[in-house]
Each structure stands twice: as C-alpha cells, then as structure tokens.
C-alpha cells in the first residue's frame, strides 16, 4: 500500500493547494475525477488492514479459521495480492500478516477521513470509520515503536515465522501482534536502511504541519490521552533531535571502529567504522553526511494503550554517507515541515544558524532552538547536495556496490530431479528449461546476468561517467575480470526516485518558505550547465531574437 497511499497523499496536497479539481481518462469510462479515483484507491487499501488469511489477530494457530473482522488490525500491512482463473471461474485474494513502520501513512488515512472530495470517493460501507480507526492505530504503532534514541523500530506480525506459531515467551505485543525487529525480510533485515526513517517520518511531519497550520481536525489518538498533534509532536521532537545530534555538516575530525552483530541471527560480529563525532567536526561549507544504516537492540514494552518510554529499545549507527540523495532530500523535507509547524520563519535564519553552530545536544536545546536548527539543517542539506552533486543531467553521485559481483557469481539452481510434474514423471534439472520474455534461455546453472542480458547494454545507451569510452556494464565486467570482485567499480546513477525526492524537498521549501534564498549569500554557487554548448533555435519570421548577455551570439 506504500505507493497507493503516496498517491492519495499527493491528491490531498493538490486539493489543499486548490488544483485538485482535475479529471483523467479512466478505464472505468470517460473523464474521472482524480479525487474520486483516489477515494476508490482508499476503498481498495482497506484490504491492507487485514491479516493475510483473515485469521483473528493474535490467534497463534495455523488451523484457525479466517473470514471476519476479527482479522482486522487496522494497520497498513506489507501487501495485498489477488488473482484467479483467466475465464473468471474462480478467484483468490489475501492480505498480509506483517506490518512495517515504513509502510504506515497516517497522512493518507487523515486525508481520506477529512478531505470531502476524497471521502466522497470511498463507496464501501464503513470506509470512513475504518480509516478513523486506522489513523489512530497507526499513530499508536509509531508511539509503541519509537526507540529510546528517536528512530522508529521495525513493526509487528500476526503470523510468527509466517506459520501462525506461538509467540516466543516475553515477546512484546501490540494489540496481540508480536514485535518484529525486521518485518517481512530478514536477509538483509528490512529496518536497517535510513530511508525507512526519513520516508515514514516525512509523512508525520507533513501531517503535523497540516493539523497545526490549517486549524484542521485534531482527533484523539486511541486511549493515549493525546490529541493527534500532541502524539505527532512527541514523536517528531525526539526523532528530529536524534538527527540533529547525528547529522554532519562538514567532516568529522576522527573515526571510530567497533564490532557488532549486523543481524540478530549472526554468529559472528561485523567490524564497522563510522565518524567519531566526539572528536568534533570541521565544517568546510561543502561536505555533509547522514546516518545510512542502523542496527537494533532490545524491544518495546507491551502496548497498554498509553505511551511509555522504551528505555530497552535502542539503535546504533553502523554507517554514514552522503550519496543516497533521495534520503538526504527526504530528511530535509521532514525538517522543513517540522520547522514550519513550529512557527519558524525565514527571518529566523540568522538566529537559526547561530543556534545550530553553537548547539551541544538536542536535549539541551529549547523547543524554539530545536525548530530553528531543524530549518537551518534542512536548508544546508538541500544547498550542499545541489552544489556538490549537480551536473548536466541532474544530481548524481559516484556510487559503489561490492555486491555487483553477484551478477556473474549467483547461479540459477533448478530442481535436481526430486520433483515430479503433472505427468507423474521425475525430471532432471536439465529438463527444466525455458525462455525469458527477452529471449534469454533459462536453464540450471546460468548466471544472474545470463537471464537478464539487457544489463549488458550492447547498444551503449548507458555510458559510464566514471570510465570514459566504456558502457557501465563493460566497465563493471572489466573490474570483475581483473580481481574477481567489483571493489574498484564506481558508477554514477541519476535515480528517478532520488530526483523525485529532491524535487519534492525543493518544492516543500518553496511552498513553506518562498522568500528563502538559494544560498546564504543569495548567489548560486555554480553557473548553469548547458549541454550541448551550441543550440539551434528556430523563430518565426516576425520575431527578432537578441541575446541579453555579453559573449552570446546567434
């Protein structure tokens, strides 16, 4: 439901800006209201509020029957799936038993309840009541999963080990669902990546701004005794404070190395090296770095309906970086919404800069200082990524991924002859063959890239910016052939989702702070890059085109 809720969120924004009254051609016939279609999508995501097989929440029994609202957890689960026969003679549909903090979207739930155009698009009986309950339940989940440090822990499940087994003794629960450090995926764990934090909490910060600035509906959150705005503030204050303490503008003056288990099931420890912030930071005005990966320890308390400090639930930073520009931008987006909701104005930037440069820890800052520092940090992240990584295409970082050796080393393993087909014949692995849609042959032992030959890029469409004259694939293969790994392979990508998050963060800054200068000195740090350098322009006979800059000729 992540993408669906984002779409609903986008339509809600459009409606708030007064530009959402649009229609699109629809397969359901004629021009359809975008808001009505978003409401219809809300109807459909109600299935994400159910257990995979609609079994009762907390049943812990694989033989338990499903099929009633007892199987409704009101959270956004990991997926919905459906299918059936081509002739329509039968069909199936499932929900999911696992709920990740990353996939919750209280802003979308709030929009479906409170935006009249979106709400009118929902036709299912009880849809409004379901999303009212879902909004409250999602907020309770975030309160339950907030660590002692600030970041949000993994999630919960109604199906232990995917088999509805009994929960382990002492396992923390949330409305009879068991805590999971890494819901859905364990290899690698699903809640290491910092993107889970910044994407999820951006929605909370935007919702906080909406409720605070629009004199909007501010309902109670379950039995917590907190209004929605109060619950959001409790989460955001600690979360923002943690990022304020652990984001680097400049470069740390030293490093520290330690060992820890990356996954809960690891038998050996991994060595990590990260910046040592205790040795201070030297700000060169250009560099920046944010936490990139976390490991988790402990678990939350059992949820009893009211917020409790989770003193036994902690996280540790095991990676830093500046190359994940989508995450950097989403963090900036979050900080900007938080600052605006707290009442920080553009005119406060001088004080915000001073406050940030003189800060010690977030816990020592007043509410006003933390909000001002938030705006300053958000703006600095946007300015620095723009100045450091902008090129003639967009924003791109020279990246590195040692796992790319798996392109050639990971082999397809087909059945070894122990499986029978429908004709009751035992087939050897050599008999299991087929063809991919692109024509690649599927057979036992072929490499990952052999059935994805489009990666080989024989057309030269994807040239390497890091090794002139070679395609990205040929350059990677050359590095692999030379050393048996891709440790020396670097590549520059302009990822679509990075570009999307960058544009949305810049848009948020313009929406909330339209008078904010691009850089502190009011002058862009780079001239516009135009490629190619010679451009032919055709104008009508009645028009005269004249350059307005010296040195320009036509």
Residue ranges and their predicted role:
Residues 491-527:
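A recurrent domain-boundary module in secreted/ectodomain proteins
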Residues 1-34:
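Post-signal peptide N-terminal segment of secreted/secretory-pathway proteins
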Residues 530-534:
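Surface-exposed, proline-enriched loop/turn segments that connect beta strands in immunoglobulin-like
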Residues 1-2, 32-498:
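Extended ligand-binding clefts on enzyme/binding-domain cores
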Residues 535-541:
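Short, solvent-exposed loop/linker segments at the N-terminal edge
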């Amino acid at each position: 439901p992540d993408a669906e809720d984002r779409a609903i969120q986008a339509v809600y924004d459009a409606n708030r800006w007064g530009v959402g009254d649009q229609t699109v051609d629809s397969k359901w016939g004629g021009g359809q209201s975008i808001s009505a279609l978003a409401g219809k999508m809300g109807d459909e995501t109600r299935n994400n509020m159910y257990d995979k097989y609609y079994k009762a929440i907390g049943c812990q029994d694989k033989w338990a029957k499903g099929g009633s609202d007892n199987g409704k957890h009101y959270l956004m689960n990991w997926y919905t799936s459906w299918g059936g026969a081509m002739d329509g003679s039968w069909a199936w549909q499932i929900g999911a038993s696992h709920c990740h903090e990353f996939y919750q979207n209280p802003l979308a739930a709030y929009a479906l309840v409170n935006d009249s155009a979106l709400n009118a698009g929902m036709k299912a009986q009880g849809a409004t009541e379901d999303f009212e309950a879902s909004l409250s339940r999602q907020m309770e989940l975030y309160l339950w999963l907030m660590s002692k440090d600030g970041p949000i822990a993994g999630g919960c499940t109604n199906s232990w080990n995917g088999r509805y087994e009994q929960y382990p003794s002492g396992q923390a629960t949330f409305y009879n669902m068991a805590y999971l450090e890494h819901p859905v995926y364990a290899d690698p764990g699903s809640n290491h990546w910092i993107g889970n934090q910044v994407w999820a909490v951006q929605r909370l910060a935007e919702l906080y701004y909406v409720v605070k600035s629009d004199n909007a509906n501010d309902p109670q959150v379950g039995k917590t005794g907190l209004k929605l705005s109060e619950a959001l503030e409790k989460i955001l204050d600690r979360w923002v404070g943690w990022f304020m303490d652990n984001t680097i503008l400049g470069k740390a003056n030293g490093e520290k190395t330690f060992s820890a288990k990356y996954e809960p099931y690891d038998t050996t420890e991994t060595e990590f090296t990260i910046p040592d912030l205790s040795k201070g930071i030297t700000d060169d005005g250009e560099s920046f770095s944010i936490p990139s990966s976390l490991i988790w320890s402990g678990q939350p308390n059992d949820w009893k309906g009211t917020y409790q400090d989770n003193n036994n639930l902690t996280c540790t930073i095991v990676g830093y970086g500046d190359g994940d520009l989508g995450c950097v931008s989403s963090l900036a987006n979050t900080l900007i919404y938080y600052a605006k909701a707290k009442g920080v104005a553009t005119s406060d930037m001088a004080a915000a800069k001073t406050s940030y440069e003189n800060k010690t820890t977030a816990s020592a800052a007043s509410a006003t200082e933390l909000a001002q520092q938030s705006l300053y940090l958000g703006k600095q992240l946007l300015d620095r990524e723009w100045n450091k990584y902008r090129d003639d295409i967009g924003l791109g970082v020279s990246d590195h991924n040692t796992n790319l050796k798996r392109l050639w080393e990971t082999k397809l393993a087909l059945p070894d002859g122990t499986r029978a087909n429908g004709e009751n014949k035992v087939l050897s692995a050599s008999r299991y063959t087929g063809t991919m849609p692109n024509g690649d042959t599927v057979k036992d032992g072929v490499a990952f890239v052999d059935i994805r030959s489009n990666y080989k890029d024989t057309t030269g469409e994807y040239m390497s910016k890091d090794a002139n004259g070679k395609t990205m694939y040929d350059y990677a293969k050359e590095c692999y052939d030379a050393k048996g790994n891709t440790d020396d392979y670097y590549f520059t990508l302009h990822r679509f989702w990075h570009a999307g998050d960058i544009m949305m963060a810049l848009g948020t800054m313009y929406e909330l702070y339209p008078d904010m200068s691009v850089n502190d000195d009011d002058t862009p740090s780079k001239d516009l890059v135009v490629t190619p350098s010679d451009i032919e322009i055709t104008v009508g006979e009645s028009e005269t085109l004249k350059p307005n800059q010296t040195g320009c000729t036509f």
